[in-house]
């Protein structure tokens, strides 16, 4: 049975892990969200999130955005190659509804997979 959990091993936790992704990454982006990724040696993808106060002022809005992105990653983790991924949220994402945000992030997962495989 396929597991759809989001355990600690699926997260980027340390500053060193985040920093490694910023050096020569594979990119997939839209106007509101950028995905940066590098191949990892694990048997699964890992996710790191950054939602700056500069773009999303209220904590509840930042938490909502992170929750939607984490949930999308959790459900699509088996379709994503073995990459360390950092999601950068930019201006304009706060006005998006959850369904619209989910649709955008799923499109970016596919775009990132194509760039990695192709």
From Swiss-Prot:
Gene this chain is encoded by:
rnpA
Keywords from UniProt, A to Z, are: Endonuclease, Hydrolase, Nuclease, RNA-binding, tRNA processing
Q: Which Pfam families match?
A: Ribonuclease_P
Functionally, this protein is described as follows: RNaseP catalyzes the removal of the 5'-leader sequence from pre-tRNA to produce the mature 5'-terminus. It can also cleave other RNA substrates such as 4.5S RNA. The protein component plays an auxiliary but essential role in vivo by binding to the 5'-leader sequence and broadening the substrate specificity of the ribozyme.
The organism encoding this protein is Shewanella oneidensis (strain ATCC 700550 / JCM 31522 / CIP 106686 / LMG 19005 / NCIMB 14063 / MR-1)
InterPro entries per record: Ribosomal_Su5_D2-typ_SF, Ribsml_uS5_D2-typ_fold_subgr, RNase_P, RNase_P_CS
What is stated as this protein's family in its record? Answer: Belongs to the RnpA family.
Instruction: State a GO cellular component annotated for this protein.
Output: ribonuclease P complex
Task: State how it assembles.
Answer: Consists of a catalytic RNA component (M1 or rnpB) and a protein subunit.
EC number in record: 3.1.26.5
Task: Please name the PROSITE patterns in this protein's record.
Answer: RIBONUCLEASE_P
Q: Which domain of life is it from?
A: Bacteria
Q: Which NCBIfam families match?
A: rnpA (TIGR00188)
Task: Give the reaction(s) catalysed.
Answer: Endonucleolytic cleavage of RNA, removing 5'-extranucleotides from tRNA precursor
Q: What is this protein called?
A: Ribonuclease P protein component
Gene Ontology terms, MF aspect = 3'-tRNA processing endoribonuclease activity; ribonuclease P activity; tRNA binding
- One Gene Ontology biological process: tRNA 3'-end processing
């Amino acid at each position: 049975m396929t597991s759809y959990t989001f355990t600690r091993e699926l997260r980027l936790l340390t500053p060193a892990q985040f920093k490694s992704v910023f050096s020569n990454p594979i990119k997939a982006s839209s106007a509101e969200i950028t995905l940066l990724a590098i191949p990892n040696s694990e048997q699964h993808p890992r996710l790191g999130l950054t939602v700056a106060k500069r773009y999303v002022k209220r904590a509840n809005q930042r938490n909502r955005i992170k929750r939607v992105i984490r949930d999308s990653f959790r459900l699509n983790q088996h379709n994503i190659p073995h990459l360390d991924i950092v999601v950068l949220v930019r201006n304009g994402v706060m006005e998006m509804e959850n369904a619209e945000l989910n649709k955008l992030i799923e499109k970016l997962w596919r775009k990132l997979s194509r760039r990695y495989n192709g």
